[in-house]
């Protein structure tokens, strides 16, 4: 009998998928639409348009933007669209909602751009630990996309994983 230690994890055919690899680098910022409203609640069209066109949007160059309104103002749909039209010239991506909504959309976009044929009929483990904050919704979305193509799907680390699906 041999006393040689064999690293079965290293010799495994298991493919590790790390969602952190899909993290889009760049600043995430919130833009509160209420800053251009009268007393934070009333949209006066002429003043609003003037404020939007005179604002220096270059501060958001290369950023990922979560556009929202922190007050209970009743807004016409075009208000957020007018701001989006300005941001669209400088920002990488804009979403209506929170920073969590923004992060979700960034991961959905990245997952949708993946070529899943590489994972066809292979055992895949979705890495659970990462240094970046990965939204739970990204794990859910990735599972939906991978399950139809993989042979088996796990969560965690190769040395201690949770089985999720097996054909």
Task: Give residue ranges: language-model regions.
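Short, non-transmembrane amphipathic alpha-helical segments
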Residues: 82-87, 138-147
């Amino acid at each position: 009998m041999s006393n040689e230690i064999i690293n079965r994890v290293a010799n495994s055919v298991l493919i590790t998928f790390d969602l952190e690899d899909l993290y889009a680098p760049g600043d995430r910022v919130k833009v509160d639409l209420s800053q251009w409203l009268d007393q934070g609640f009333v949209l006066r069209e002429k003043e609003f348009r003037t404020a939007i066109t005179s604002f220096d949007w270059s501060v958001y160059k290369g950023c990922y933007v979560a556009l929202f309104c922190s007050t209970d103002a009743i807004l016409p749909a075009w208000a957020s669209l007018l701001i989006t039209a300005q941001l669209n010239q400088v920002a990488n991506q804009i979403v209506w909602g929170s920073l969590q909504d923004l992060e979700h959309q960034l991961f959905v976009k990245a997952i949708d751009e993946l070529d899943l044929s590489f994972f066809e009929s292979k055992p895949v483990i979705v890495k659970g630990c990462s240094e970046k904050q990965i939204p739970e919704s990204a794990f859910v979305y990735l599972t939906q996309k991978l399950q139809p193509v993989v042979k088996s799907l796990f969560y965690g680390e190769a040395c201690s994983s949770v089985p999720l699906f097996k054909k």
